[in-house]
């Protein structure tokens, strides 16, 4: 059995690194789906729909069979969705509000077989407690630019990891891709995971 092509419908370097870490070779084909077309207030439903739309947009463009993986993440604090900050000032204000607080990082996962259009969906939720960081730390962190590119204004795998006091649940979900959930999706799709390690 040949190993099917696995396509990551995301430009996220963190997701690509996670996949490489577990020995999965992927083609990167970022989705250009307009996320503003999806307006949902429920965080898990939002990320699940966005992950599906991203994967579907890339799956439709395939001329050869492939499994397409789409993901989307969002942070919610007290049920309020916190996306990527639009400016440094917004990132600073966000951090001043969330320091010392618990948040929930939701990541939607969608795997689509481009040939059969079969789909497998999952959403992972991880609780994160932010440290009691000082204003000077917040401003220095925002000045690095890292928070401006991340859901929730932090990157666990980057400098932002210094400001995470506690994690309850899957830590790779916080980075943008739950490896345990990915395994479940690949198994459901009959992807030969162990064989992929041998190629």
From Swiss-Prot:
InterPro entries from the UniProt entry: ITPase-like_fam, Maf-like
Task: State its Enzyme Commission number(s).
Answer: 3.6.1.9
Gene Ontology CC annotations of this record: cytoplasm
Catalytic activities = a ribonucleoside 5'-triphosphate + H2O = a ribonucleoside 5'-phosphate + diphosphate + H(+); a 2'-deoxyribonucleoside 5'-triphosphate + H2O = a 2'-deoxyribonucleoside 5'-phosphate + diphosphate + H(+)
Keywords from the UniProt entry: Cytoplasm, Hydrolase, Nucleotide metabolism
Extract the GO molecular function terms from the UniProt entry: nucleoside triphosphate diphosphatase activity
What Pfam families does the annotation carry?
Maf (PF02545)
Output the PANTHER family linked to this UniProt entry.
BIFUNCTIONAL DTTP/UTP PYROPHOSPHATASE/METHYLTRANSFERASE PROTEIN-RELATED (PTHR43213), BIFUNCTIONAL DTTP_UTP PYROPHOSPHATASE_METHYLTRANSFERASE PROTEIN-RELATED (PTHR43213:SF5)
Function text: Nucleoside triphosphate pyrophosphatase. May have a dual role in cell division arrest and in preventing the incorporation of modified nucleotides into cellular nucleic acids.
Protein's UniProt name:
Nucleoside triphosphate pyrophosphatase
Which organism encodes this protein? Synechococcus elongatus (strain ATCC 33912 / PCC 7942 / FACHB-805) (Anacystis nidulans R2)
């Amino acid at each position: 059995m040949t190993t099917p092509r696995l396509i990551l419908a995301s430009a996220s370097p963190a997701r690509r690194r996670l996949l490489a870490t577990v020995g999965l070779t992927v083609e990167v084909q970022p989705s250009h789906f307009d996320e503003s077309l999806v307006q949902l207030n429920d965080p898990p439903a939002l990320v699940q729909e966005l992950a599906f739309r991203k994967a579907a947009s890339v799956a439709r463009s395939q001329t050869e069979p492939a499994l397409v993986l789409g993901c989307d993440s969002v942070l919610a604090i007290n049920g309020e969705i916190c996306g990527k900050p639009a400016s440094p000032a917004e990132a600073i204000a966000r951090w001043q509000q969330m320091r010392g607080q618990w948040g929930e990082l939701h990541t939607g996962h969608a795997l689509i077989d481009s040939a059969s259009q079969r789909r497998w969906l999952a959403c992972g939720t991880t609780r994160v407690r932010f440290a009691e960081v000082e204003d000077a730390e917040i401003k220095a962190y925002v000045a690095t630019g890292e928070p401006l590119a991340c859901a929730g204004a932090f990157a666990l795998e980057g400098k932002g990891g210094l400001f995470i006091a506690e994690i309850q649940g899957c830590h790779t979900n916080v980075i943008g891709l739950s490896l345990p959930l990915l395994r479940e999706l690949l198994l459901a799709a009959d992807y030969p995971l162990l064989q992929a390690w041998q190629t």
